Amino acid sequence: SVDAAFQIAMDVLDKARNQQYALEGEHGMWSAGAFQGTGMGFGVWCRDTMQMLLRGIGFIDPKVTRRTVEYILKSGKDNAVDGLAAVVISVWEYYLVSHDRELLLKNADTIKEKIQQCEEVFNRENGLVYAAFCSSNDAYEDSEAGGYALSTEIYFMYAFECAFNILKCIGEPAEHYKVLAAQMLEMIRNKYWNPTAGIFTSGPDGSVAFKDEVWE
């Protein structure tokens, strides 16, 4: 039943913030996983924090969520370039739930630095970010995507949207990032939609994924 599934989910979340599973220096935060046993937690990851926030974790425990977001702004684990987008998205998703403007102002310099890092990996010539790794498994290169994995492109597009909203909220120039987000959205629609397959493939036109009609 739905109630049973909810209780299982809450039990998993309780372990994810449990001190028994936390790594040193990461107590009171959302860990990416507790499956390795007591004292052997998986740690606080940028990508996994983003995924939890996109699924509403901020409503469950706002204090733990804030602590986690502030942590990944300065630290946090990641394997690939998607970790940059994940941090910016996490900040905005937390704000949407909390309206905690104090966090934005307190960490404004660090947030702007993360936004700048996102822009630094953006290729203005093709309107995409070089992303050899898909976000669903960013420990292994997605060779079929031809260096431009769809999921990571989508996260960067949304990260630029979040950057626009964050900067606007704290009174900083923001319009530039709205333009970047729109440019990425256009390129994703143009390059990844495979009309024969009727899907967005995990790589753009010209990649193995596009040719073989592979969906991530």
Regions found by a protein language model. Give the residues of each.
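Extended, well-ordered alpha-helical scaffold segments
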Residues: 4-9, 61-74, 101-119, 163, ...
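Generic detector of bulky aromatic hydrophobic side chains
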Residues: 10, 14, 50, 114, ...
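Conserved helix-loop functional segments at active or binding sites
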Residues: 15-19, 61, 93-96, 120, ...
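The feature captures the catalytic groove of carbohydrate-active enzymes
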Residues: 77-82, 116-182, 186, 193-216
